[in-house]
C-alpha cells in the first residue's frame, strides 16, 4: 500500500520552489504562475499566486511525496496557511543571495512557528543560490535555528539539480519515517 506524505516548499518569491518541484516531479507540474507585476518583475518573469503541485515516488516504490510549492509574496500568505494544514513536512528555502538572508530566514521561521503548521511536522532548511553568495554559511544558519529554539537539518541546494533536490527530499523522508516509527513504538 502506497503511503502519501504532503510536503510543502516555502520561501520568498524567487527562492526556487517551483524550480525544485519541476526538477523532480514525476507528473506534469500543476502551476498557478502568472506574469509578475510589481517589484517581483525585476527578479523573474512569473510568480506563483496559488500553488505548484508535483509528485515524487520515493525510491523503493512504497511512499509518495505530494509536493506543494507556496507563493512567496507576503500578500499570498493566506495560501501558505491553507497549504500548511495537514502537512507532514516542510522544505524551507533560504535565498542566500538576498541582502540579509539570515533576517529573512528568521522571519520565515517565526511565520512557520506562528502559523497553522502541525506541531509534529518535520522541517528541513535548504540554502539556495550559494553559488552566487557563499555567505552566510551553514553554521550561521544552524546558529540562527538554535537562537529560535529550533533544531533540524540544514543543507545547500541547487533547485535546478534533480539530484540535489532528491537528496534533500530523501533526508526529509528519512526524518518523516523516523518520526512515524517513534510514534508507532512509543
Region spans (language model):
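Inter-motif core of Ras-like GTPase G domains
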Residues: 76-99, 114-116
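Conserved C-terminal guanine-recognition region of P-loop GTPase G domains, centered on the G4
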Residues: 96-150
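Canonical P-loop GTPase G-domain recognition
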Residues: 132-186
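Switch II (G3) loop of P-loop NTPases
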Residues: 60-77
